C-alpha cells in the first residue's frame, strides 16, 4: 500500500501539525466566509463542517457573490446526557449565535447547530467550554460521539453502561493540543522531537470515521450493529459483567459503485468489563494500521474486515488486546424505538420521553419546543438525555414534580400530539438546504411523507404495527436507512431509491426494491404491499420480515455479496 498514492486527506493530516493546519489564519481572515480547501477537512476534527445555503446558491452566483457560507457544529456528548444547566447554555448559543435559531438532535445522541457564521465559531466553542462541553472529535477520522442506551428505567445497569461509554469517549480522544490552542487561546506547549503526541492515533489518525455504541438489551435504540464497534451489555443479577463485542458495521455507500455497501457488524464474542479499553484500543489500532488509506470510499472498518477476513482480524485483535474472546453470551436484542410519555424507574424516579420530530428543536406557531425545554431546564433537578431516535428524555423527575414538568411540556407542544407507532420509530437526516452531500430532501419533507404512510396503514387496518421508516438525502446513511424496514435514500430532487426487508430489531439490512422513483410511485408500491401485509402476515410478523418471507426482496445475509446482488 505504501507504493500507491494515498488519498489526499492522508497528506493533509500528515502535514497539519496534528490538526492545526492554517485554521487560525483562516479564522482571522475577513476576506471570505470560508476556510481553505485543506482546512475544510481539518476543521472536521474540531467538530464542524463548512456548508452553504443551497436554496440561495444560484441567486448569489447571479449576483456575483460567494456562496452564503456557514458552519454546522456538532458537540461531543457521550451517551447523550447533559445537565439542565448545560442545556440552558446550549439553548442560549442557538438563540444568539446561529442564524437557524434552533438546536438539532442527531441520530448519535448529541446536538448540532446550523447556520453559524465563521466569526461566531470561536465564541460558540468557548461558550460550550464554560458549560464543560466541547466539539472535539465530533467529526473527522477519529472515534466519534460514543452512543449509549439512555434507558433510565434500569437505572443501576444504565449507570454502569454509561460509565463505560464515557470512559471510551475520554480514553480515545485525540491528544493534540490544537483545539485548546486555536479555540480556547491556550499557549502552545514546547515539545521534544521524539515526543509521542498521539499514542493511539499516530500522526495520520484513522483512515476514516469510527463509530461506537453501547447497547443495553433488550433495547437496541443505538442500532449497535450499524457501528464500527459495538458493546452489547451482559448483566447477571442486575449487575454489568461484560459485553458481547461487535465490529464492522457502517451505513455509508456510493450510488452506482458496487464495491461500496452498507454492512452490519459481526459478533466476535464476550469480553469482561475490565477488558473493554484493551479491546477498543486493539480494534481501533488494527483499523489504523490495516485500513485502506488509498481509497476513502473503501476505508471504513467494515471493508478492512471483509478484505482481511473475519478470522485474521479476530486473531490480530486478540493479539493486541492480550486477551482472548470468550463465547458470545445469549442476549435478546429488541425494539429500536423510544418509550414515549412517563415511565417509572426502579429507583422510584420518573422519566418523560418527548417526541421531537426529526430532532429539530425550534419555536413554531403552536409548538414552542425550544422555549418549552428552556422552561423545563430552569426547574428540572435531574438530567436531559438525548436519544438516537432524535428525541429528548427529561430524566430523574421526582413524583412530586411530575405535574409541573408535564404542564410545561403540554403548554409548549412537547406533549399531546397524536403519535402513531410508525412515526415514533422513524427518523430522517438534515439533507437540504445545508448538507452539501444531499441529493434530495429529507428532514423538511419527512413529516409529510410519514403522514402518507400513516394514512396507508390506517386504510389497511395496520396502524397498530410499528414500521421502522428512515429517509436520507444521500447514501452516506446518517439516519441509518439501510437498517430500516422501509428505507428511502435520495437519488435526485424528488426521487429516492426504495429499500425493503430489514428486520425490526436492526439485525438484518434491507435491499433495494425500486430505484429512482418519485413520491406517487413510492406510495403506490407501499399501498399494494400494506394491503398484502394486512391479509397475508403471520401472527406477530413484522413488515420487514414479511417482505422477505413472501419474496418481495431477498434477505441480505452477507452484505458484500448480497446487498447489490
Swiss-Prot record:
NCBIfam families: CysI, PRK13504.1. Its cofactor is siroheme; [4Fe-4S] cluster. The lineage of its organism: Bacteria, Pseudomonadati, Pseudomonadota, Gammaproteobacteria, Alteromonadales. One of its GO terms (biological process) is cysteine biosynthetic process. Siroheme binds at residue 478. It catalyses: hydrogen sulfide + 3 NADP(+) + 3 H2O = sulfite + 3 NADPH + 4 H(+). Binds 1 siroheme per subunit. Binds 1 [4Fe-4S] cluster per subunit. This is Sulfite reductase [NADPH] hemoprotein beta-component. GO terms for cellular component: sulfite reductase complex (NADPH). It holds the Pfam family NIR_SIR_ferr. The keyword 4Fe-4S applies. It comes from Shewanella baltica (strain OS185).
Amino acid at each position: 500500500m505504501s507504493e500507491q498514492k494515498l488519498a489526499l486527506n492522508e497528506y493533509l493530516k500528515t502535514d497539519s501539525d496534528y490538526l492545526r493546519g492554517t485554521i487560525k489564519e483562516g479564522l482571522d481572515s475577513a476576506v471570505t466566509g470560508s476556510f481553505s480547501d485543506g482546512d475544510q477537512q481539518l476543521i472536521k476534527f474540531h467538530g464542524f463542517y463548512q456548508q452553504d445555503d443551497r436554496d440561495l446558491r444560484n441567486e448569489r452566483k447571479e449576483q456575483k457573490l460567494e456562496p452564503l457560507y456557514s458552519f454546522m457544529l456538532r458537540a461531543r456528548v457521550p451517551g447523550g446526557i447533559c445537565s439542565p444547566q448545560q442545556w440552558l447554555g446550549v439553548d442560549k448559543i442557538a438563540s444568539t449565535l446561529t442564524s437557524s435559531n434552533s438546536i438539532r438532535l442527531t441520530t448519535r445522541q448529541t446536538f448540532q447547530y446550523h447556520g453559524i457564521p465563521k466569526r461566531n465559531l470561536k465564541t460558540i466553542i468557548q461558550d460550550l467550554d464554560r458549560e464543560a462541553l466541547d466539539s472535539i472529535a465530533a467529526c473527522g477520522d477519529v472515534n466519534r460521539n460514543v452512543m449509549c442506551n439512555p434507558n433510565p428505567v434500569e437505572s443501576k445497569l444504565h449507570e454502569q453502561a454509561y460509565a463505560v461509554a464515557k470512559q471510551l469517549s475520554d480514553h480515545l480522544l485525540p491528544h493534540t493540543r490544537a483545539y485548546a490552542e486555536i479555540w480556547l487561546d491556550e499557549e502552545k506547549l514546547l515539545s521534544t522531537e521524539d515526543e509521542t503526541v498521539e499514542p493511539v492515533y499516530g500522526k495520520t489518525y484513522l483512515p476514516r470515521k469510527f463509530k461506537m455504541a453501547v447497547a443495553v438489551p433488550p433495547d437496541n435504540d443505538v442500532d449497535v450493529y450499524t457501528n464500527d464497534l459495538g458493546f452489547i451489555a451482559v448483566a447477571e443479577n442486575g449487575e454489568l459483567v461484560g459485553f458481547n463485542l461487535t465490529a464492522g458495521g457502517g451505513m455509508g455507500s456510493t450510488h452506482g459503485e458496487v464495491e461500496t455497501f452498507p454492512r452490519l457488524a459481526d459478533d466476535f464474542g464476550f469480553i469482561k468489563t475490565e477488558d473493554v479499553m484493551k479491546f477498543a484500543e486493539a480494534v481501533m489500532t488494527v483499523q489504523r494500521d490495516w485500513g485502506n488509506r488509498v481509497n476513502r470510499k473503501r476505508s471504513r472498518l467494515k471493508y478492512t474486515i471483509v478484505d482481511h477476513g473475519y478470522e485474521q482480524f479476530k486473531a490480530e485483535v486478540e493479539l493486541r488486546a492480550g486477551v482472548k474472546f470468550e463465547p458470545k453470551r445469549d442476549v435478546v436484542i429488541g425494539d429500536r424505538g423510544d418509550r414515549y410519555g412517563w415511565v417509572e424507574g426502579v429507583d422510584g424516579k420518573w422519566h418523560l420521553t418527548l417526541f421531537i420530530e426529526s430532532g429539530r428543536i425550534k419555536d413554531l406557531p403552536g409548538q414552542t419546543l425550544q422555549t418549552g425545554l428552556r422552561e423545563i431546564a430552569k426547574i428540572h433537578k435531574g438530567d436531559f438525555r438525548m436519544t438516537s431516535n432524535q428525541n429528548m428524555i427529561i430524566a430523574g423527575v421526582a413524583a412530586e414534580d411530575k405535574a409541573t414538568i408535564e404542564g410545561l411540556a403540554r403548554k409548549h407542544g412537547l406533549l399531546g400530539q397524536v403519535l402513531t407507532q410508525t412515526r415514533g420509530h422513524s427518523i430522517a437526516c438534515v439533507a437540504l438546504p445545508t448538507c452539501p452531500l444531499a441529493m434530495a430532501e429529507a428532514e423538511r419533507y419527512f413529516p409529510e411523507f410519514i403522514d402518507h404512510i400513516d394514512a396507508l396503514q390506517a386504510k389497511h387496518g395496520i396502524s397498530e404495527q410499528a414500521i421502522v421508516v428512515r429517509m436520507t438525502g444521500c447514501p452516506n446513511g446518517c439516519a441509518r436507512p439501510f437498517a430500516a424496514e422501509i428505507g428511502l435514500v435520495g437519488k435526485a430532487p424528488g426521487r429516492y431509491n426504495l429499500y425493503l426487508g430489514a428486520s425490526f430489531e436492526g439485525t438484518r439490512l434491507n435491499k433495494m426494491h425500486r430505484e429512482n422513483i418519485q413520491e406517487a410511485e413510492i406510495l403506490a408500491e407501499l399501498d399494494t404491499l400494506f394491503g398484502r401485509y394486512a391479509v397475508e402476515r403471520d401472527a406477530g410478523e413484522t413488515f420487514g420480515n414479511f417482505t422477505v418471507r413472501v419474496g418481495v426482496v431477498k434477505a441480505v445475509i452477507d452484505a458484500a455479496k448480497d446487498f447489490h446482488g
